C-alpha cells in the first residue's frame, strides 16, 4: 500500500501536543526504523565563524523521510561546492514520534473483510519529529568565505520540509560569549 501524503501527518489541528498514548518504542511492536541514519556530517573539529540554521515558524511534525531528503540535499550541495573538510552539518531533531494508520480497503466486497472503526487504533507506519516555532531543524557551521554556499544549501534543504521555515545566521564568536 502506498504512503499517505505528508499533509495527513504534518499539522496537528487538535489541542497542543499533549502526547498520544503508548509512544515509547519498547512498548510498540513493529515500529519501522527511521530512514535517516546519519545526523552529523562534515568536519566537527574545524574552526568556524558562523552557524547557519533552518528553523520552523509553525508547530507540526516532520516525517523521517522528509528529514532524510533534506539531509541528502544539503550534504550533496555542500560536499560538491566547498568540500567535506570545510563545514560541519548536523540534523538537530530526531523522529521519536510513532505514526499509526488504520488501513482501510477500497475494493468490491471490502465491507465483509474489514472492521471499519472497530478496534481502529492503527499499525505503526513510520516516525516523525515534533517541532515547535523557533526550533532549529538543520544546522551548518562554516567559515566566512563559505557563508553564501551554506545559505544556498539550507535553502535547498528547507524546500524538502513540510513546514514553513526560515534561515538564520549566528556569528559563532558572539554565541561563545553568550554561553560563557
UniProtKB/Swiss-Prot annotation:
The keyword Ribosomal protein applies. The keyword Glycoprotein does not apply. One of its GO terms (cellular component) is ribonucleoprotein complex. GO terms for molecular function: structural constituent of ribosome. This is Large ribosomal subunit protein uL16. PANTHER family: 60S RIBOSOMAL PROTEIN L10. GO terms for biological process: translation. Keywords: Ribonucleoprotein, Ribosomal protein. InterPro entries: Ribosomal_uL16, Ribosomal_uL16_arc, Ribosomal_uL16_CS_euk_arc, Ribosomal_uL16_dom, Ribosomal_uL16_euk_arch, Ribosomal_uL16_sf. Pfam families: Ribosomal_L16. NCBIfam families: PRK04199.1-1, PRK04199.1-4. Belongs to the universal ribosomal protein uL16 family.
Amino acid at each position: 500500500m502506498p504512503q499517505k501524503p505528508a499533509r495527513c501527518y504534518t499539522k496537528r489541528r487538535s489541542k497542543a501536543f499533549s502526547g498520544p498514548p503508548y509512544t515509547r518504542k519498547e512498548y510498540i511492536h513493529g515500529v519501522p526504523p527511521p530512514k535517516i541514519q546519519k545526523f552529523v556530517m562534515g568536519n566537527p573539529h574545524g574552526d568556524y565563524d558562523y552557524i547557519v540554521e533552518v528553523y520552523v515558524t509553525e508547530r507540526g511534525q516532520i516525517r523521517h523521510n522528509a528529514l532524510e531528503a533534506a539531509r541528502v540535499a544539503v550534504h550533496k550541495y555542500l560536499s560538491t561546492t566547498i568540500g567535506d573538510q570545510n563545514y560541519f552539518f548536523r540534523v538537530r531533531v530526531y523522529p521519536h514520534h510513532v505514526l499509526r494508520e488504520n488501513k482501510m480497503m477500497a475494493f468490491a466486497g471490502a465491507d465483509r473483510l474489514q472492521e471499519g472503526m472497530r478496534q481502529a487504533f492503527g499499525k505503526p507506519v513510520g516516525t516523525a519529529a515534533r517541532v515547535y516555532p523557533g526550533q532549529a531543524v538543520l544546522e551548518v557551521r562554516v567559515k566566512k568565505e563559505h557563508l553564501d554556499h551554506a545559505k544556498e544549501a539550507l535553502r535547498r534543504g528547507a524546500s524538502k520540509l513540510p513546514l514553513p521555515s526560515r534561515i538564520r545566521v549566528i556569528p559563532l564568536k558572539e554565541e561563545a560569549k553568550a554561553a560563557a
